């Protein structure tokens, strides 16, 4: 039957009900059905009176159970012995019952005290073929007679919700339609090259499309035949991965839908045995699905004794596919109605359909073309860039013959520039001609003594995602082996969307095949080009992100030699500590060159087995002064800094000025707790310095404070105040400045924006400043709504240090109300406008009661009440929080197990936030920390690799945190909130999970801790969500309402205008620098685009400020803090590089060549030249109807721009 487009469009969407003619063959008419239900109610009442614990009807011989698409059975008289560790649990039921039909759900109930038997629930979908419980309502399992009842209530609800179509099933949440065929492939020049699916080397016996609208994903379910062995597989595609519209094509009696996607699908294989139910009391059919990274039968191992490669020529190349073609047979009107219903509902998710002719292009020698990637004539660096282009689908392996032939004709440098331009352009070059390789192009090679390019690669279950070289400030290892820098590689293991980690914890048993791929990676390495990169080591922060360093070993240097150079770790007998100590050498640091320090090791202050100086030592003033110059700190001298030096790690704070002997030279005084391993390396390295930033409440802290007695109205007042100030500041310069200076972020971006506004850029309609401000508004609003991150003006986020004078009063266990003292002296950013850019900062000392907490905080005792005091002996310490070294117990340790080796603390002196329950007993370690020993008879590094895999497998930190959120707000199931046993136990588990990286001991969350439902602010599925009336829930809904009613756009939309700033007209030497500015800007733009592409960031404003707007589907899964930190770090390197490079090219790096007044004027002229070049490009771009030009280059010189503006305004006012 031929189908035309008009036929399809004219289909009227309708729901099939039980009154449909074909349905009458299956279901009694309504009057008959109502009569049937009437008898059911009578039976139900009789049963309820006989058994109060079960109000469901027991129907022995009725056929009503056949009517629905699901049936729920209650199994009684189950022996409690089944619940023992060796008792078999739910497997005892699954094994005999699964032969009767598909079991969707099983749960066995915990028996009450003294009971010898219990009950279980078993759901079949569809109902079983035969009533195995008839004729007497019993079944015999393992020699035990079990009673069987039908749960009529659950059964009836499923009958009433059914929506049938003749060949499929559909509802508002789920669509299931049979497929005539499907193909996965690669888009190639507007055609589709099929690589997997029907007629692609695999026998598919049956396939179906399932679309879960509530989970925003579509699934292809199919049976594959392998030598008479049938295996069931599932491919999952998230809606957010789909690119553009859904293509539709009609021909004869078929319709095809085309989905293009950014990321490979998740592959699942269905297990034939529910062995995991032996240890479970709760089981669903989803437990049968096992993650896979290839389409292979159960008994075939996909891992091989070879390195992982991008182009695998042996198995189905699903990782290389980026398009899905689904074909449906159209047999009658109901089939057309199914497709119309599907497309109509997809449009609700902005997935619109349009005509798209499907043209297939067969490539019979595809595997041969893939093998060309190992061409040994291609230089390694070129091979790496080529595979980076392939991994991002900017080039296609189908074109490898012509690509390789033309790259060989180019010089090495020209070939590299050609490939780097493709990477930064983000425009695919498909079916290239010889002319494409001969076009003129330029690309700037960014390098400096302080930064190094390191390869970076993401390993997903199905593919590799290779990124262009990552700019690194460097670490001790790479700086020492800088001649081999191009052989280092940062590898991160992720799920298919490469910003999401592979889930561990309770999902671990379902991911075994993925872990075997990770083991293959660690054992055999990664092959890129003709180089094999092998596992080297990982740092602590890398481990938490499932990352590690790899190295391409050779005869001149190998990974083992590098590890031996790092230091002597022979005295460490714990695998996790061994790995952590090696990881110290990979901390990103700034080396203080040509600066020798004298080391004087100090004892720790220890009392009652509590260390009060854990991780913190001292440094002399001369060391701090030199450090400040090296890091080019624009604030006052930092009072403390996080460092690495040989085997030492932690924080060094400025020694008390009263101890003159501590300042007789370049002296550092590390503590014994900071000495981690032996090393000959003695250069001082800096990780970060102490800086001021504002305090913020988050979901966890709000939840704890509310539980401890703070009124929820206080949190709402803070939220309303912050949002109303944002609204008021839109049309007020002064209010904008105040608002920004009252909310200083950790990267001081708000201070830079405030200085731009103070210098008059906003009132002169400067596009860049306008965009920064709009971005900030949108970023803050999203944070409040999604993470309840509320700013607290009377608070700070500071690095913790110890009171070396012993002046502050500490915590005493026997005190009636122990309120220890702390010292806080912070930057007062509100006292002087423009102070940030001029460096004239003032400070103030905080006095009064405060709350102190560390992120994350889940236990009521994690929030401590302290008294901030003025202390003359500590006035030399600024922008740090000083903890006492007296008392019975360390305050940082009571703040969710913190220490002083670099931890930062939130301190708030807003009296409204002081809790009624003061200093609840902290969480103490219930047992001594364990450790994992090394494997016997194997190299030490093998134990480290095994630990790495186990960490990924059992990393349950996020799972535990989310469970705590849900239970803490579910007062129906947990009336005591944060003080309930379930929350206290989860807090303790969370603490152990945090220590997993150090202890090596995993914390496994049992099924009983899984939430029964979720508060609305967690934005889970509606069926398991409830309206939270806690402060967090109210903030969530208030922010959502504010976003709707404020009139501001729901998403950030950058503005482009072409207003020239008259303040840039003044400098008289400007024309001398225009050509240089244009040249350097071109290079800067290329590298900025690289950062934007690498982190999938839409605008340069987000990179400039680190105010990154994540897509809604990803905001809850991405590690926002880590990503912002990495982006800020990368941009900071870029900024330093190009400001220095530009001034050097302008011959302005040496001030001695000019007198001071001319030098200042020439610097201002050079900066103004960058503005003019950018303005001209922007005008041209807008004139051409595009907005792709980047405009941030002049704003790298923010302080100089502000100085120029103030000078111009002063000149104008004098006239």
Curated annotation (Swiss-Prot):
Cellular compartment(s): Cytoplasm; Nucleus; Chromosome, Telomere; Chromosome, Centromere
Catalytic activity: RNA(n) + a ribonucleoside 5'-triphosphate = RNA(n+1) + diphosphate
PANTHER family for this protein: RNA-DEPENDENT RNA POLYMERASE, RNA-DIRECTED RNA POLYMERASE
Subunit structure: Cid12, hrr1 and rdp1 interact forming the RNA-directed RNA polymerase complex (RDRC). The RDRC complex interacts with the RITS complex via interaction between ago1 and hrr1. Clr4 has a role in mediating this interaction.
Cystine connections: none
Enzyme Commission designation: 2.7.7.48
InterPro entries xrefs: RNA-dep_RNA_pol_euk-typ
Chain's role: Has a role in the RNA interference (RNAi) pathway which is important for heterochromatin formation, accurate chromosome segregation, centromere cohesion and telomere function during mitosis and meiosis. Required for both post-transcriptional and transcriptional gene silencing. Required for silencing at the centromeres and for initiation of transcriptionally silent heterochromatin at the mating type locus. Promotes histone H3 'Lys-10' methylation necessary for centromere function. Required for recruitment of swi6 and cohesin to an ectopic dg repeat.
Protein's name in the database: RNA-dependent RNA polymerase 1
Entry-linked Pfam families: RdRP (PF05183)
Record GO biological process: chromosome segregation; co-transcriptional gene silencing by RNA interference machinery; negative regulation of G0 to G1 transition; regulatory ncRNA-mediated heterochromatin formation; silent mating-type cassette heterochromatin formation; siRNA processing; siRNA-mediated pericentric heterochromatin formation
Main location: cytoplasm
């Amino acid at each position: 039957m031929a189908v035309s487009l008009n036929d399809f469009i004219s289909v009227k969407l309708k729901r099939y009900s039980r009154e449909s003619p074909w349905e009458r063959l299956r279901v009694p008419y309504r009057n008959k059905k109502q009569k049937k239900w009437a008898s059911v109610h009578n039976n139900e009442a009789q049963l309820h009176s006989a058994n109060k614990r079960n109000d469901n009807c027991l129907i022995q011989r009725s056929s009503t159970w056949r009517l629905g698409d699901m049936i729920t059975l209650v199994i009684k008289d189950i022996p409690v012995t089944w619940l023992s560790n060796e008792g078999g649990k739910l497997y005892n039921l699954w094994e005999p019952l699964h032969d009767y039909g598909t079991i969707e759900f099983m749960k066995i109930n915990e028996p009450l005290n003294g009971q010898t038997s219990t009950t279980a629930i078993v759901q079949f979908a569809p109902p079983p073929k035969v009533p195995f419980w008839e004729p007497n309502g019993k079944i015999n399992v393992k020699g035990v007679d079990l009673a069987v009842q039908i749960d009529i209530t659950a059964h009836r609800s499923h009958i009433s919700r059914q929506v049938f179509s003749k060949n499929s099933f559909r509802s508002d949440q789920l669509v299931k339609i049979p497929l005539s065929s499907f193909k996965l492939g690669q888009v190639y020049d507007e055609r589709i090259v099929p690589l997997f699916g029907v007629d692609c080397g695999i026998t598919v016996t049956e396939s179906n499309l399932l679309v879960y609208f509530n989970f925003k994903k579509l699934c292809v379910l199919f049976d594959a035949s392998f030598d008479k062995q049938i295996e069931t597989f599932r491919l999952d595609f998230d809606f957010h991965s789909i690119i553009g519209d859904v293509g539709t094509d009609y021909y004869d009696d078929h319709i095809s839908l085309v989905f293009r996607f950014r990321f490979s699908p998740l592959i699942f294989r269905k297990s034939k045995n529910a062995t995991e139910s032996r240890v479970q009391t709760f089981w669903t059919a989803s437990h049968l699905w096992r993650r896979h990274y290839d389409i292979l039968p159960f008994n075939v191992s996909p891992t091989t004794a070879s390195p992982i490669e991008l182009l695998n020529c042996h198995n189905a190349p699903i990782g290389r596919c980026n398009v899905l073609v689904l074909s449906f047979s159209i047999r009658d009107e109901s089939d057309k109605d199914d497709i119309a219903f599907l497309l109509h509902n997809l449009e609700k998710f902005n997935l619109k359909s349009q005509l798209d002719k499907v043209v297939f292009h067969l490539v019979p020698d595809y595997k041969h073309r893939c093998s060309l990637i190992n061409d040994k004539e291609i230089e390694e660096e070129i091979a790496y860039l080529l595979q980076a282009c392939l991994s991002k689908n900017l080039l296609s392996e189908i074109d490898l013959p012509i690509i390789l032939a033309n790259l060989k004709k180019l010089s090495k440098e020209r070939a590299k520039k050609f490939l780097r331009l493709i990477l930064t352009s983000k425009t695919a070059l498909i079916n290239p001609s010889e002319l494409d390789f001969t076009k003129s192009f330029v690309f700037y090679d960014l390098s400096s003594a302080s930064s190094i390019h390191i390869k970076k690669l993401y390993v997903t279950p199905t593919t590799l995602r290779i990124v262009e070289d990552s700019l690194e400030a460097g670490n001790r290892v790479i700086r020492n082996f800088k001649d081999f820098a191009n052989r280092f590689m940062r590898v991160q293991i992720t799920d298919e969307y490469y910003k999401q980690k592979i889930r561990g914890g309770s999902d671990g048993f379902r991911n075994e095949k993925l872990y075997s791929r990770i083991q293959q990676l660690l054992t055999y390495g990664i092959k890129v080009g003709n180089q094999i990169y092998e596992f080297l080591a990982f740092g602590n922060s890398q481990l938490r992100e499932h990352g590690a360093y790899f190295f391409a070993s050779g005869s001149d240097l190998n990974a083992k030699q590098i590890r031996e150079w790092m230091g002597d770790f022979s005295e460490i007998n714990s695998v996790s500590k061994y790995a952590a100590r090696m990881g110290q050498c990979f901390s990103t640091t700034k080396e203080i060159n040509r600066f020798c320090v004298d080391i004087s090791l100090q004892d720790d202050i220890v009392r009652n087995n509590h260390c009060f100086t854990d991780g913190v030592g001292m440094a002399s003033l001369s060391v701090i002064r030199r450090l400040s110059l090296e890091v080019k700190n624009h604030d006052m001298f930092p009072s403390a800094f996080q460092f690495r030096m040989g085997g030492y790690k932690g924080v060094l704070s400025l020694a008390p000025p009263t101890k003159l002997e501590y300042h007789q030279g370049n002296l550092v005084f590390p503590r014994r707790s900071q000495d981690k391993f032996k090393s000959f390396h003695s250069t001082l390295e800096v990780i970060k310095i102490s800086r001021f930033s504002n305090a913020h409440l988050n979901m966890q802290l709000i939840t704890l404070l509310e539980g401890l007695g703070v009124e929820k109205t206080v949190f709402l007042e803070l939220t309303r105040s912050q949002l109303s100030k944002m609204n008021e500041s839109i049309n007020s310069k002064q209010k904008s400045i105040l608002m920004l200076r009252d909310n200083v972020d950790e990267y001081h971006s708000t201070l830079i924006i405030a200085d731009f506004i103070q210098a008059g850029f906003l009132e002169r309609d400067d596009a860049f400043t306008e965009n920064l401000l709009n971005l900030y508004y949108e970023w803050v609003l999203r944070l409040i709504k999604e993470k309840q991150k509320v700013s607290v003006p009377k608070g700070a986020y500071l690095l913790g240090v110890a009171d070396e004078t012993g002046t502050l009063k500490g915590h005493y266990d026997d005190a009636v109300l122990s309120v220890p003292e702390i010292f806080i002296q912070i930057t007062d950013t509100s006292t002087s406008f423009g102070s940030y850019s001029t460096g004239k900062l003032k400070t103030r000392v905080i006095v009064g009661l405060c709350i102190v907490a560390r992120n994350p905080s889940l236990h009521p005792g994690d929030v401590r009440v302290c008294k901030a005091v003025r202390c003359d002996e500590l006035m030399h310490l600024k922008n740090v929080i000083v903890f006492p070294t007296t008392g019975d117990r360390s305050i940082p340790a009571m703040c969710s197990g913190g220490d002083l080796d670099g931890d930062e603390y939130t301190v708030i002196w807003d009296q409204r936030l002081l809790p009624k329950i003061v200093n609840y007993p902290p969480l103490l370690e219930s047992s001594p920390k364990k450790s994992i020993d090394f494997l016997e008879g194997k190299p030490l590094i093998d134990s480290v690799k095994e630990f790495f895999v186990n960490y990924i497998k059992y990393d349950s930190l996020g799972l535990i945190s989310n469970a705590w959120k849900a239970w803490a707000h579910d007062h129906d199931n947990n009336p005591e909130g944060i003080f309930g046993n379930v929350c206290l136990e989860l807090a303790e588990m969370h603490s152990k999970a945090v220590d997993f990286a150090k202890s090596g001991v995993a914390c496994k969350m049992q099924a009983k801790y899984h939430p029964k439902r979720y508060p609305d602010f967690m934005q889970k599925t509606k069926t398991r969500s409830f309206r939270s009336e806690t402060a967090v829930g109210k903030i969530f809904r208030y922010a959502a309402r504010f976003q709707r009613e404020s009139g501001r756009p729901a998403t950030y939309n950058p503005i482009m205008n072409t207003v020239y700033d008259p303040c840039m007209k003044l400098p008289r030497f400007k024309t001398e620098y225009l050509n240089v500015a244009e040249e350097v800007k071109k290079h800067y733009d290329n590298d900025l685009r690289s950062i934007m592409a690498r982190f999938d960031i839409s605008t340069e404003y987000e990179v400039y400020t680190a105010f990154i707007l994540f897509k809604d589907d990803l905001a809850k899964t991405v590690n926002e803090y880590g990503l912002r930190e990495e982006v800020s770090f990368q941009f900071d390197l870029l900024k330093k590089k190009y400001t220095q490079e530009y001034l050097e090219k302008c011959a302005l790096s040496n001030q001695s060549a000019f007198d001071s007044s001319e030098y200042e004027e020439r610097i201002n002229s050079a900066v103004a030249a960058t503005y003019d070049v950018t303005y001209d490009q922007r005008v041209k771009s807008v004139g051409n109807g595009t907005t792709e030009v980047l405009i941030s280059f002049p704003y790298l010189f923010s302080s100089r721009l502000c100085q120029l503006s103030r000078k111009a305004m002063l000149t104008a006012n004098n006239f």
